[in-house]
UniProtKB/Swiss-Prot annotation:
Binds only human holo-transferrin (TF), via the TF C-terminus. Forms a large complex with TF and TbpA. Interacts via its C-terminal domain with Slam1. Keywords: Cell outer membrane, Lipoprotein, Membrane, Palmitate, Receptor, Signal, Virulence. It comes from Neisseria meningitidis serogroup B (strain ATCC BAA-335 / MC58). Belongs to the TbpB family. Isotype II subfamily. Pfam families: TbpB_A, TbpB_B_D, TbpB_C. This is Transferrin-binding protein B. Has 2 lobes, each of which has an 8-strand beta barrel flanked on their N-terminus by a 4-strand handle domain. Electron microscopy suggests that in the TbpA-TbpB-TF complex, TF is captured directly above the loop domain of TbpA in a chamber of about 1000 Angstroms(3) formed by the 3 proteins, where interactions between the proteins serve to abstract iron 2 from TF. InterPro entries: OMP/PagP_b-brl (IPR011250), TbpB_B_D (IPR001677), TbpB_C-lobe (IPR035316), TbpB_C-lobe_sf (IPR038197), TbpB_N-lobe (IPR035313), TbpB_N-lobe_sf (IPR038669). Residues 78-104, 123-144, 223-256, 309-338, 364-398, 442-495, 689-712 are annotated as: Disordered.
């Protein structure tokens, strides 16, 4: 029904509104609308972080120095053979530290002798299985041990040698004349420490051994009876038959003596990261008020992670220029280095070469032996170890331990996270007893440091292959300086196969953390494959893929206390279900690549973050965790809708559902500039959202990130 009043009102209202606008009573002017402009997302950049200092010592399981034999034939004019840093040989990972190092032992086994073919060794080492091995290690062999510090498990040091055949060649050039023992001094260990006492001062005692240079007319009468030209024609060493001046054959100790032979007494201040100590000889002749001990060196070193580096100061130097000492310990050393072994740093090994290249020293020391009743022995300062099942002598205040490094390997689809060895050097990957440098030799900072992205001119990630060299016939010729290992079949246990490691490592902006992909490739030789096999069969590869992460943890005292700190980085991931569908992604600094972002509240001990897959908008995983000391633990989960494993499948997209993956990680660098972590989810069907198309879900992930600061 048509209502004229309504029609009239409908016509008047627009006119009224229009007149109101024209009259200034209202406005549609956009300039006067009070709206807040959208704020741009904050822009971040990596914080500056101090680069690791170049390490002269790259670490390792152990090192050995071979005895020298001088060509004393006059016309050869070889009046002196000094020791050199390049003479150090890496021992490799020992099967059992009490045994002789395999590489060096294989060299001495081939040494010819004039009479007996025995290998003589330190009496506490496992006898050699060589013919008549260890025969004669009785009264004439030094007894070398520190009282109450004798039961070593992780580190051994010592000497072994043969009475080498006399060489006298005057018929064929080059003419030569050599005589004397041929062998090694060494230390080696297993299970480099991942945790150490957080504080407190701990005493370590043990033994040390030396080998000298050779020089015409040189005698060391104070330590060795030179009846066979020790120090002149061949190296004098602590296991020599002529070492008659220590108390090696005494049945009881004299007051003031710390043990038998050459012993060490060290103290580690774990709070201040300092090692100090002394190397002494326990003297044989203490009659006529002679000193019961003679100190030859004092040690001082800085502890970094599970390694230490410093100096050895000779304490019995000549007092005047005209004075001479009839022992080789007259020069300081700037090359003291070593490391801690055992789950809690129970034992340590060390080495150094004197600056005058006259003497090399190796040693091993441990915390106090546990009493026979099994109770933990008292630590330095008289306080008992508080940690249950703690190692003897490694108790600190309240028995607290601190993690100094992470090194893990996660095999794709495996439930277990395996621990890797590491020598507090994130840029050295240690697998199968072999050390793999993760940075190119041309790196601006050396093998143990990272280039700084574009500043260093390196890619964000690096891919390379590493094939260990075959065992050399002569271990001395085949071993490089500073622990670069060269053995493959022996040390790496490849059982005659050629093993190649394919490595992808991230990231160029991380100095104290490295993570990535590792592929082991084993290919048999034609002989290994069998005479009837073809060359193609011989080259068949066995491929095993995994991820790794390793980092140098921040000192707990240096963990920040700020809130809302942003870290950004990347990640490697492998996500799968049991329906043969999987997704994998590698680390990248591309805007659309695998991204990791975390917010850390150090004050509240909380960490939250996301891992986002390449070319995805929604987070693949969200992570929530709690910070403890210099690390964190938490959980990772996918969104309730799951993670699409194959986006190209538009009909029935297979998904992965993960709700409770256990995450572990840590903070790395001097000031926690870097963080990283890992998780391996085993593949349980754990959520009601999982469908038959999805099956059981599994995931393997490693991630890393750098602390950010706003761009100014």
């Amino acid at each position: 029904m048509n209502n004229p009043l309504v029609n009239q009102a409908a016509m008047v209202l627009p006119v009224f509104l229009l007149s109101a606008c024209l009259g200034g009573g209202g406005s549609f002017d956009l300039d006067s609308v009070d709206t807040e402009a959208p704020r741009p997302a904050p822009k971040y950049q990596d914080v500056f972080s101090e680069k690791p200092q170049a390490q002269k010592d790259q670490g390792g399981y152990g090192f050995a120095m071979r005895l020298k034999r001088r060509n004393w034939y006059p016309q050869a004019k070889e009046d002196e053979v000094k020791l050199d840093e390049s003479d150090w040989e890496a021992t490799g990972l020992p099967d059992e530290p009490k045994e002789l190092p395999k590489r060096q032992k294989s060299v001495i086994e081939k040494v010819e002798t004039d009479s007996d073919n025995n290998i003589y060794s330190s009496p506490y080492l496992k006898p050699s299985n060589h013919q008549n091995g260890n025969t004669g290690n009785g009264i004439n062999q030094p007894k070398n041990q520190a009282k109450d510090y004798e039961n070593f498990k992780y580190v051994y040091s010592g000497w072994f040698y043969k009475h080498a055949k006399r060489e006298f060649n005057l018929k064929v050039e080059p003419k030569s004349a050599k005589n004397g023992d041929d062998g090694y001094i060494f230390y080696h260990g297993k299970e480099p420490s991942r945790q150490l006492p957080a504080s407190g001062k701990i005493t370590y005692k043990g033994v040390w051994h030396f080998a000298t240079d050779t020089k015409k007319g040189q005698k060391f009468r104070e330590i060795i009876q030179p009846s066979k030209s020790q120090g002149d024609r061949y190296s004098g060493f602590s296991g020599d038959d002529g070492e008659e001046y220590s108390n090696k054959n005494k049945s009881t100790l004299t007051d003031g003596q710390e043990g038998y032979g050459f012993t060490s007494n060290l103290e580690v201040d774990f709070h201040n990261k300092k090692l100090t100590g002394k190397l002494i000889r326990n003297n044989a002749n203490t009659d006529n008020n002679q000193a019961t001990t003679t100190q030859y060196y004092s040690l001082e070193a800085q502890v970094t992670g599970n390694r230490f580096n410093g100096k050895a100061t000779a304490t019995d130097k000549p007092q005047q220029n005209s004075e001479t000492k009839e022992h080789p310990f007259v020069s300081d050393s700037s090359s003291l280095s070593g490391g801690f072994f055992g789950p809690q740093g129970e034992e340590l090994g060390f080495r150094f070469l004197s600056d005058d290249q006259k003497v090399a020293v190796v040693g091993s020391a441990k915390t106090k032996d546990k009493p026979a009743n099994g109770n933990t022995a008292a630590a330095s300062g008289g306080t008992d170890a508080a940690a249950s099942n703690g190692a003897a002598g490694t108790s600190s205040e309240n028995g607290k331990l601190t993690t100094v490094l992470d090194a893990v390997e996660l095999k794709l689809g495996d439930k277990e996270v395996q621990k890797l060895d590491n020598f507090s050097n994130a840029a050295q990957l240690v697998v199968d007893g072999i050390m793999i440098p993760l940075l190119p030799e041309a790196s601006e900072s050396g093998n143990n440091q990272a280039n700084q992205g574009t500043n260093g001119g390196t890619a964000f990630t690096r891919k390379f292959d590493h094939t260990p060299e075959s065992d050399k016939k002569d271990a001395q010729a085949g071993t490089q300086t500073n622990g670069a290992q060269t053995a493959s079949n022996t040390a790496g246990d490849t059982n005659g196969k050629t093993k190649t490691y394919e490595v992808e490592v991230c990231c160029s902006n991380l100095n104290y953390l490295k993570y990535g992909m590792l592929t082991r490739k084993n290919s048999k030789s034609a002989m290994q494959a069998g005479e009837s096999s073809s060359q193609a069969d011989a080259k068949t590869e066995q491929v095993e893929q995994s991820m790794f992460l390793q980092g140098e943890r921040t000192d707990e005292k240096e963990i920040p206390s700020e809130q809302n700190i942003v870290y950004r980085g990347s990640w490697y991931g492998y996500i799968a279900n049991d329906k043969s569908t999987s997704w994998s992604g590698n680390a990248s600094n591309a805007t659309s690549g695998n991204r990791a972002e975390f917010t850390v509240n150090f004050a509240d001990k909380k960490i939250t973050g996301t891992l986002t897959a390449d070319n995805r908008q929604e987070a693949t995983f969200t992570i929530d965790g709690n910070i403890k000391d210099n690390g964190f633990e938490g959980t990772a989960k996918t969104a309730e809708s799951g993670f699409d494993l194959d986006q190209s499948n538009t009909t029935r997209t297979p998904k992965a559902y993960i709700t409770d993956a256990k995450v572990q990680g840590g903070f790395y660098g001097p000031k926690a500039e870097e963080l990283g972590g890992w998780f391996a989810y085993p593949g349980d069907k754990q959520t009601k959202n999982a469908t038959n198309a999805s099956g059981n879900s599994s995931a393997t992930v490693v991630f890393g990130a750098k602390r950010q600061q706003p761009v100014r």
